[in-house]
Curated annotation (Swiss-Prot):
InterPro entries: HC-pro, HC_PRO_CPD_dom, HC_PRO_CPD_sf, Pept_S30_P1_potyvir, Potyvirid-P3. It is an enzyme of class 3 (hydrolase). This is P3N-PIPO polyprotein. It comes from Potato virus Y (strain N). Its EC number is 3.4.21.-, 3.4.22.45.
Length: 986
């Protein structure tokens, strides 16, 4: 390979270096590399907008510590980008600019730039320039000796003048010179002197300690001081530790700053004490702060005087009287004790009056002979004793008055109750209560005067009972949650339960008969014509106006029949309404509506859509019981959860009690009973009630209005006002008027008399037992019975065979599953019966089984008693349990005396009769039903722990043999084997 020489010049030097040129024979061919595909390119393109916003976002921290982005707006991002572009452009122009030569660089040297430039004169100065020069004053610095001399001079001056020195470091320390034990000593201001109780009473740094050592060295610094001579007012005094004698705590720096003593030991203010020592320490503060607060505020708070004051009373006596007044008005052991203040503030008003009365009397006794000099104090204490004298309140009189008229809130009893409460409070009444009592007394005087005048007149010409022009506010019809989008009332579950009313007490209007067949409403003393015929609207205006007139029926004028009174006062809701001149308001033509409930007596009436019945036909109340519309109106105020119980109570309890054509008083009484169960119905609005004095009938207007006009209008518009009729003391003829009746379609409701409530409904023991036997081998029937009448389970205790048959068929387990989430008391009953079946199965004889069942009656009765209940078998179950319980108690007494009461033959006969009844229930089944019962019993075996069989043979074996014989036949081959299998299954 050839070698060549190359020359490199370094200034004037030359350097020659050999080199060999590279061979060009081998050419390295670059390998083509396929371009890589970025898998995230598309994702970055999609997220470019988000990443751009995230690039300029800032980070912020939420209250819960979460870090989040705070994104900029598009306008803010544009401004930021423009700013960055401008900055990059300026930097680019600077980098691309031509180079410049820097000839000189000076740092804090040379002439300032302003002198290198020529100064052009701005004008001619016509005044003499200022010749004064600024003088720089030297900083005065003291040497250590001069500083010590200054401190010494300040100490001498302040100690002679009893002045103060402030030492300012990180915080200010106040040093005061005062005379203590015959010498002037320095004292600092501690925390307890400012009213603060802290474990460390005084804190200072080392620089302050050094100055305190110099300032505390007064003339008698070295004199001996004993700790027993330290008294109150010496707090904060700086003493010499070396000259201090006695029992004292630790200190530092040769200084002892007095704080207080505990158990004879003197403590330094800089020492940290425990909390127990702090609470019981005697601190040596004085009363200067008290007198400072008194002197500083006395002149500012005193009132102006109309004379010139002179000092005529001794100061010491004034101080003694001031202490007497303080203990008479604000008694305390220590004036600075917060516990005494809290106890005083927490006293009831009655106890405070007693305390002030006692202390005012003690203050008068302590004043003694000085009452002639301090006559103003004597007069004040006498007035205080009189004002706080306890009043002897006779609670028996208050209780007697309250029992008589406490529940009466109408005038004048309301005013009497106000005065009764006023007298009970005695001197605790406020000024407002005094004013209310005076107004009540004024109302009583007016009432008595008016009553006397009316008695003298002996007529009702002054009776007025105006009908309010304002409609009642019904919350249930105004709540948005109860209305649909068209502002119509939503019945919800109430609509379903309202069918109990429509199925029993309403009838469908038959279009084939026409509306005219339903126009006449009959009542015991006459008829009333409905406006149902006007549902067919005539298009002729004259004919339509003629129909709007109605059929006028003349009623007698306002008389005593229209009024209701109690204790000589009118009960206005129970009276007929009148006009301003005293004449009665007569009813007008009420137009009909379709499928509406019309409620409201004052103002405009309200139309509520009726609940839907079983069909789309119109419904009308059956002849004779229009009062059921009152309960239908009450259903509006009933919650959906209580709608079922409410409708059942009305159907099973109220309607049987009212009977046919009840009086207004009976209807009001049932409404009062329903209000106890459902308090929300107290303000339920009623339909308009028309009073017919000629026939002594009250008509409840329904959706079909009234064609007959001229009736009086009852003022009662709500349930609470209607209940006022349910009062024997109410003097009223209207309360004896008839209002509607019971439907003819359900006469059986009142056929049975209940021993628990008059006119109620109850199922007999034999009927209930037949119903129970009917469902033992019918799973679907038993399930429905458990849902409708769960207390049928109790009747299983009448027979051990029935009890174990129900257990083996899983009926108790089914009852627990059905009622465990609905009503746990019924689930408890089923559990007790299941456990009872376990114990009964272990008994060998029938008498032993009866004894076990009778002993469990008490627990079952406790679990069954659950207040008022609407189930028909509930009173039957209670009666059965009560009979068994009473029998067990009587038999137990005889058994303990040695006389067994069970007659074996009687028990066997009863059990045999019930067993045959159980067998007959199974015999009535066809082959398929018998197989179904057998299969269900086999499945029920899996859900219970064990299947129980009685040890006495004959009863259940006959049942099993009857089933197998019916299924397989008596002579079928292999029948014995199949019988055994079926017996095991059962």
């Amino acid at each position: 390979m050839a070698t060549y020489m190359s020359t490199i010049c370094f200034g004037s030097f030359e350097c020659k270096l050999p080199y060999s040129p590279a061979s060009c024979e081998h050419i390295v061919k670059e390998r083509e590399v396929p371009a890589s595909v970025d898998p995230f390119a598309d994702l970055e393109t999609q997220l470019s907008a988000r990443l751009l916003k995230q690039k300029y976002a800032t980070v912020r921290v939420l209250k819960n510590g979460t870090f989040t982005y705070r994104y900029k707006t598009d306008a803010q991002i544009m401004r930021i980008q423009k700013k960055l572009e401008r900055k990059d452009r300026e930097e680019y122009h600077f980098q691309m600019a031509a180079p410049s030569i820097v000839s000189k660089i000076t740092i804090a040297g040379g002439d300032p730039p302003s002198k290198s430039e020529p100064q052009a004169p701005r004008g001619i100065i016509h005044t003499t320039p200022r010749m004064r020069k600024v003088k720089t004053r030297p900083i005065i610095k003291l040497t250590e000796g001069q500083m010590n001399h200054l401190i010494k001079q300040i100490k001498q001056i302040m100690s002679e003048k009893r002045g103060s020195v402030h030492l300012i470091s990180k915080k200010t320390t106040h040093v005061q010179y005062k005379k203590i034990l015959g010498a002037y000593s320095a004292a600092v201001r501690t925390a307890h002197m400012m009213g603060l109780r802290r474990r460390v009473d005084f804190r200072c740094d080392m620089w302050t300690v050094g100055l305190l050592q110099r300032l505390a060295r007064t003339d008698k610094w070295s004199n001996q001081v004993r700790t027993i001579n330290i008294r109150r007012g010496d707090s904060g005094v700086i003493l010499n530790t070396k000259s201090l004698k006695g029992h004292f705590g630790r200190s530092s720096g040769g200084l002892f700053i007095v704080r207080g003593s505990h158990e004879g030991k003197l403590y330094d203010a800089r020492s940290r004490v425990t909390q127990s020592i702090l609470n019981s320490m005697i601190q040596f503060s004085n009363a200067d702060n008290f007198w400072k607060g008194l002197d500083g505020n006395w002149a500012r708070m005193r009132y102006p005087s109309d004379h010139t004051c002179v000092a005529g009373l001794p100061v010491e006596d004034c101080g003694r009287v001031a202490a007497l007044m303080a203990h008479s008005i604000l008694p305390c052991y220590k004036i600075t004790c917060p516990t005494c203040a809290q106890q005083y503030a927490s006293l009831p008003v009655s106890d405070l009056f007693k305390l002030l009365h006692k202390h005012a009397r003690d203050g008068l006794n302590r004043l003694g002979a000085d009452k002639d000099r301090f006559i103003h104090v004597n007069k004040f204490l006498i007035a205080l004793e009189h004002l706080t004298e306890p009043v002897d309140l006779n609670l028996e009189l208050f209780n007697e008055i309250f029992k008589s008229i406490g529940e009466k809130q109408q005038a004048p009893f309301k005013n009497l109750n106000v005065l009764n409460n006023f007298f009970l409070k005695g001197k605790e009444n406020t000024a407002h209560e005094w004013q209310v009592a005076q107004l009540s007394l004024l109302e009583l005087a007016r009432f008595q005067k008016n009553r006397t005048d009316n008695i003298k007149k002996g007529d009702i010409s002054f009776f007025r009972n105006k009908l309010s022009a304002k409609a009642n506010w019904n919350l249930y019809l105004s709540c948005d949650n109860q209305l649909d989008k068209n502002a119509n009332f939503l019945w919800g579950q109430r609509e379903y339960h309202a069918k109990r009313f429509f199925s029993n007490f309403f009838e469908e209007i038959d279009p084939a008969k026409g509306y005219s067949a339903y126009e006449i409403r009959k009542h015991p003393s006459g008829t009333r014509k409905l406006s149902i015929g006007n549902l067919v609207v005539p298009l002729d205006l004259a004919e339509f106006r003629q129909k709007m007139k109605g059929d006028y029926r003349k009623q007698p004028g306002v008389s005593k029949k229209c009024t209701s009174s109690k204790d000589g006062n009118y009960v206005y809701p129970c009276c007929c309404t009148t006009l301003d001149d005293g004449s009665a308001i007569e009813s007008t033509f009420y137009p009909p509506t379709k499928k509406h409930l019309v409620i409201g007596n004052s103002g405009d009436q309200k139309f509520v859509d009726l609940p839907k019945g079983d069909s789309e036909m119109l419904y009308i109340a059956k002849q004779g019981y229009c009062y059921i519309n009152v309960f239908l109106a009450m259903l509006i105020n009933i919650s959906e959860e209580d709608a079922k119980d409410f409708t059942k109570k009305v159907r099973d309890m109220c309607v049987p009690k009212l009977g046919t054509w009840p009086t207004m008083m009976d209807l009001a009484t049932t409404c009062a009973q329903m209000r106890i169960f459902y308090p929300d119905v107290h303000d339920a609005e009623l339909p308009r009630i028309l009073v017919d004095h000629d026939t002594q009938t009250c008509h409840v207007v329904d959706s079909f209005g009234s064609q007959t006009t001229g009736y009086h209008i009852l003022k009662a518009s709500s349930v609470s006002q209607l209940i006022l009729f349910a009062n024997d003391e109410l003097e009223s003829d209207i309360k004896h008027y008839r209002v509607g009746g019971v439907p003819n379609a359900s006469p059986e409701l009142g056929s049975t008399i209940s021993p628990f409530r008059e006119g109620g409904v109850i199922m007999s023991e034999s009927a209930a037992l037949k119903l129970l036997l009917k469902g033992i081998f019918r799973p679907k029937v038993m399930r429905q019975l458990l849902l409708d009448e769960p207390y049928l389970l109790i009747l299983s205790i009448l027979s051990p065979g029935i009890l174990m048959a129900m257990y083996n068929n899983g009926i108790f387990e089914l009852a627990v599953r059905l009622w465990i989430n609905e009503k746990q008391s019924i689930a408890m009953i089923a559990s007790l019966l299941s456990a009872l079946a376990l114990r009964v199965s272990a008994a060998e004889t029938l008498v032993a089984q009866r004894i076990i069942i009778d002993a469990a009656a008490t627990d079952l009765l406790d679990a069954t008693c659950d207040g008022f209940n609407l189930h028909l078998t509930y009173p039957t179950a209670l009666m059965v349990l009560q009979v068994v319980k009473n029998r067990n108690e009587c038999d137990d007494t005889l058994f303990k005396a040695g006389f067994p009461s069970y007659n074996t033959s009687v028990v066997q006969i009863m059990e045999k009769k019930l067993s045959k009844s159980l067998e007959r229930c199974l015999e009535r089944f066809n082959l398929a039903r018998k197989l179904s019962a057998t299969w269900y019993s086999y499945r029920a075996k899996r859900s219970i722990h064990s299947v129980h069989k009685t040890h006495r043979k004959g009863r259940f074996e006959r049942v099993i043999q009857h089933i197998t014989t019916s299924v397989l036949g008596p002579k079928r081959p292999g029948g014995q084997r199949h019988c055994l299998r079926i017996e095991r299954a059962i």
